[in-house]
Every structure is written in C-alpha cells, then in structure tokens.
Amino acid sequence: SRLEIGRDKFVDACWDWTHEYGGIIVEQIKRMGCSVDFDNERFTMDEDYAQAVRKVFCDWYHDGLIYRGKRIVNWCPNCTTAISDDEAEYKDEKGHLWHLRYPLTEPVNGQDYIVVATTRPETMLGDTGVAVSPKDPEKAAFVGKTVKLPIVDREIPIFEDWHVDANFGSGFVKVTPAHDPNDYAMGQAHDLPQINIFDEHAVVVEGYGEFTGMNRDECREAVIKWFEEHDLLDHVEELDHSVMHCYRCDSALEPWLSEQWFVAVDKLKGPALDAVNSGKVTFHPARWTQTYTTWMENLKDWCISRQLWWGHRIPVFYCEDCGWEDALTEDTDVCPKCGGHHVHQDENVLDTWFSSQ
C-alpha cells in the first residue's frame, strides 16, 4: 500500500506509471478521432504548469480568496480523503427510519419523553440538540425545554429551525452538527457544540465506553441494541433513501467535520451574478437565466484540499518554532520570521479541478 512505501516512493511510482502509459493514452485519444493539436500537449503536472497553479494559489491566498477552516465535508473513510459534491455518487438504498425515545428533563403536557426519527442512530452519540419546525404548533410547548441524551447522559436543548420538515418522521429531529451538513448549519445558527464521534476511518473515538473502537456499522447495531434493552426504541420503519458513495472505491461517504482548505466562493460569485443581472451577459434561450442564477446563489465554498499524495501539493509552509504560516511560490526550509529550521509544507494536495481551471 502507499502507506507502507511512503510518500516519496509512491509519487515516484506514479511518475513511472505516467511515463509508461501516458503515450498509450494519447494514442487511444488519436484512435477515437479527436481533432486536437497533438504537438502542443500539456500534462497537469508539467513543471511550468505546476508553477502557474502554485502562483494562482498564492495570489488567492494572499487576497483572502483561499482559507483553511473546519467545516463539514464529504469524507471517504476508506480512501481517507475529502471529495467534492460532484465526485459523490448517489445510490438508492433500502434503509430504516429508527424512532428513538429521548427522556425529557422535565415532563411536558404529561409526556416524559420525545421521539426523534433518524436514519443514522449511530451518530446520536454526538447529538447536541433536537430541532422542531416553527410550522408545527403541536411541538411549541417543547421549545426551550431539554432532554437527557441516552447513553452519554448529555443535556441538550429543543429549539425551532426552518430546516425541519414537520411532516417527516416524528417531527423531532436529532441535531449532530459534526456529522450532517444541515445539522452543521443549525448548529452554527443556534451556537451548538460540534462533537466529532468518528476518526478518519469512521471508527468511534475514545470516550464512548463500549462503543469506542467500533466502526460505524458496528456502532449502529450496538446503539439500536442498547435502545432496545433500555425500552427506548419506539418503533422502526422501512425507508427508501439515497446514500452518497465514493466514486473511487464505492464506500458510503461520511459527512465529517474536518479542517480543510476552501475557495471563498461567496466572494467570487458576486461579479458573475452581477454580469447576468445587469444584462452584460445573456442566456439563450432566456429560461436558462433563472437556472444559472439559482445555481450560483446556492453555491457553497469549495473544498479544494485532498488527503492524497499524487497531485499539486498545497504550497503553504509552517514554522513549528514561532507559528509563522504563508503561501510561497518557492519551497523553503528556513523560517523568514524567526530563522528557525523546523519548517514543513502542508501535507494536502489540491483538487484536480483547481489546477484545471
């Protein structure tokens, strides 16, 4: 495996493969009848091209258009890397909707517990809230109350949020900000703690007793068994739903809170929208204008870092002595701030689509 041979030898092996098979791929393209200038080939890892990619990254970094932050990403626990929304493949699967009882800290209208509905009971270990729809008058009396989260004995609040569909499940939605994009948004809006219960392999981290060390499938079975044994499993429904899978290895993806590099799309899309809204750019047929506008308005910041070894390595350097950080067009092993020699480059590589822009 790549981990056994190390980064340098793995990259060397990738170059060997490129030199051996790159010409074959070009010949295949020719036989397909592609009419291109084959005397003007460009490989994305060519030195001059790599320098251009590096300069763009550094320019955007210094202009505040690229930043590092901790956010929810699509994570493959098998490939151990983030992947983009466009690289995720959706598959319809037969699953279940588990209805779990969460005890109230104080009775409400004679009720001692609420029932939350979830397709992912294993993530309840990281719940930090329960949400209801503002359009659901039957739940109004519960807003502002708290429940005692089973297993971990964590007291969490009940609140209203527009992300909740009052007609889905029980109307009570468990909120796990570190393991669901909608929950992350609700957590940001309501200032909820973010608790990551999985490591990069989707294995339960330390601090969860008998569940620690279980993979996500084992954890699901164990959590359901625990709820059954404690008479807190209300009922189970069959449910057809769509699950994201990795396009490389077909593993189910994990929405995972991790530190990554992002392009600040919100800062870039304004001029593109203004050009259309002002009439400077027009679409034919005109009906595509609304499609474009809706797409642009809903774009999220783009995760451009990948935890892989083959690709354009992110040109950000760090000093372990003084904390200096900067994006550089040339490598360095000396800190320009303190003169220290404990300088290392970011381990991540760029999403291939960044270098193809």
How would you describe each model-predicted region?
Residues 1-113, 168, 172-320, 356:
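Residue patterns forming the tRNA-binding/recognition surfaces of aminoacyl-tRNA synthetases
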Residues 84, 254, 327, 341-344:
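Short functional micro-motifs and their immediate structural scaffolds
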Residues 109-114, 153-155, 325:
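Short, mixed charged/polar active-site loops
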Residues 117-121, 333:
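Acidic, glycine-rich two-metal-ion catalytic cores of nucleic acid-processing enzymes
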Residues 121-201, 228:
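Catalytic alpha/beta core of large soluble enzyme barrels
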Residues 154-159, 348-357:
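Active-site-adjacent "gating/activation" loops or surface patches in catalytic cores
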Residues 314-332:
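Cys/His-rich Zn2+-binding cysteine-cluster or related metal-binding knuckle/ribbon modules and their
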Residues 332-338:
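Cysteine-rich micro-motifs
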